[in-house]
Amino acid sequence: MPWYPWLKATVFALLAANAAVYAATGTASEALDSTAWLALLAAFEFETGFAGRFAGGRLAAVLRCVRLVAAAAILAAGIGYVLDGEWLDAANIGLWIVVVALLEFEVRYPAATARHRSQFKAAVATLYSGLAALVFAWLWQRDWFDAYDAALWLVAFATIELNLVGFGRGAVAGRGAG
């Protein structure tokens, strides 16, 4: 699909703009949260969106370091949300952490994921449903920017899921479409 790379680039640019807004006008937890997730998204995109070209070597080690630092920052932001009583944000981070853990498992162990595909799909559907419910909770609270940002993140991670099944430029090394 010729439009797919443009969709991913547009979503990434919008998320980068959101991170800038949170850095300029939000809390420290919001700034840390948005920039760390953006770094994690970029690392996942490199791993899943380029047909395994970055699966080995120096760049693979850099991507692992980026993921580790981003994960630590996300955990710190989550603690900040709990300490600030921002329960929707804390729940959002918790759900996304589990989504990322499942994505990591899917990238690292595709054969195991394939063997347990129905359970994996059910878990992912439950998590994404919870994340969608948070979008509606923010809308109900008239917190338009957080709702928009959360919806945009759902689109961003949907593109990673599409990468994993081979949509667009290619699948992860060792994975076929399907």
Task: Identify the residue ranges that each predicted region occupies.
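Polytopic alpha-helical membrane-helix bundles and their juxtamembrane interface segments
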Residues: M1-G178
